[in-house]
């Protein structure tokens, strides 16, 4: 069983520097040495993530990091590299594998996004994505519960952990809160009012997110169709998309869809996203034609992206993603 990381490693290295006649000031090398416990837990976490998915008959895959055409998304900017781009997500390639007949896939990989930096954001970060055919977003809620309970139980021997003064319980049931209910409960307005006033993101971040996942994880589900991204809309109510985000301790950890598999609808959404890029003064990406073509052969599926750095940050009670990676960008 692994204990929560403490300061023992830092103390040992500080003593070693003193014994060698070195000044034990907090240099970059000393700070890096002090991350040993957390980096060890990070390595164990990656091992157990892979174990979890292999036991559930998922195939681990690797797809190219350097791609010709990312998915156009108005609020996500890809890093250009020559005439190609570093992936913002492995999503498009993994869905092409689903279309080729692979039933269950997962991948742990590096992703890159331009101008993303903060206590919860890195321009280069680790993503876990997994996909299952003939499943929907409700299935992925159950998978998330099973994964996090397995990781916490394996690492710490209990389904509970402390984060920044809060105790977060992972035993079921987890909260399932619709976006509409969340806006009315915490935002003081409806989703339609927020969209009409162009304040959806502002209200979500400032009023709603701080209240999510504070004592137990929260699934925020059924986003408005305007924010469907690559998710399909609900058959019973096309105004809503079968999409959820998972929150722990007020932090968004994962984003999941019942996948859109209609190539015409996806092409229309990409065209709209490209127009938004142009309106914002950005150069649109090349057209992801091979992905659009593959959608016609893709079975009904569900997929999810989970931020590994944030997961490590939560499970080790760290305030910033900088504390759970060996080299934040400013230290290079």
Segments from the language model and where they lie:
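A translation/RNA-centric and nucleic-acid-associated enzymatic feature enriched
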Residues: 28-29, 48, 64-97, 106-133, ...
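TRNA-binding/sensing appendages of the translation machinery
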Residues: 13-79, 306
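Short, low-complexity, intrinsically disordered N-terminal modules
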Residues: 9-10
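Short amphipathic alpha-helical segments with heptad-repeat character
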Residues: 39-43, 47, 131, 138, ...
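Short amphipathic C-terminal alpha-helix that caps PH/PH-like domains
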Residues: 141-151
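Alpha-helical scaffold segments that mediate packing/assembly in large oligomeric complexes
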Residues: 155-192
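Cationic, low-complexity basic patches in intrinsically disordered or flexible, solvent-exposed regions
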Residues: 4
């Amino acid at each position: 069983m692994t204990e929560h990381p403490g300061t023992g490693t830092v103390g040992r290295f500080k003593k070693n520097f003193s014994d060698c006649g070195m000044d034990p000031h907090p240099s970059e090398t000393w700070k890096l040495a002090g991350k040993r416990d957390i980096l060890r837990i990070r390595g164990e976490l990656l091992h157990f993530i892979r174990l979890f998915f292999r036991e559930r008959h998922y195939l681990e895959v690797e797809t190219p990091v350097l791609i010709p055409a990312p998915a156009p998304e108005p609020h996500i900017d890809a890093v250009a590299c020559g005439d190609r781009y570093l992936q913002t997500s492995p999503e498009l390639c993994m869905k092409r594998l689903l279309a080729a007949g692979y039933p269950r896939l997962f991948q742990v990989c590096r992703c890159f996004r331009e101008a993303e930096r903060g206590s919860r954001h890195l321009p280069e970060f680790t993503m876990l994505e997994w996909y299952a055919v003939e499943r929907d977003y409700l299935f992925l809620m159950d998978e998330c519960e099973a994964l996090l309970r397995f990781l916490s139980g394996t690492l710490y021997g209990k389904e509970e952990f402390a984060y920044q003064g809060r105790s977060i319980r992972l035993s079921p049931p987890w909260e399932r809160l619709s976006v509409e209910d969340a806006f009315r409960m915490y935002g003081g307005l409806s989703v339609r009012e927020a969209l009409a006033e162009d304040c959806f993101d502002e209200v979500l971040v400032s009023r709603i997110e701080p209240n999510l996942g504070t004592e137990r994880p929260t699934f925020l589900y059924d986003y408005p169709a305007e924010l469907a991204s690559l998710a399909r809309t609900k058959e019973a109510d096309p105004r809503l998309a079968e999409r959820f985000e998972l929150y722990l301790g007020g932090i968004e950890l994962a984003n999941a869809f019942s996948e859109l598999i209609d190539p015409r609808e996806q092409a229309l959404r990409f065209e709209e996203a490209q127009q938004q890029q142009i309106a914002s003064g950005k150069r649109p990406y090349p057209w992801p034609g091979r992905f659009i073509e593959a959608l016609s052969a893709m079975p009904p599926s569900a997929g999810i992206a989970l931020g590994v750095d944030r997961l490590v940050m939560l499970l080790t009670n760290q305030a910033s993603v900088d504390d759970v990676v060996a080299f934040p960008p400013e230290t290079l």
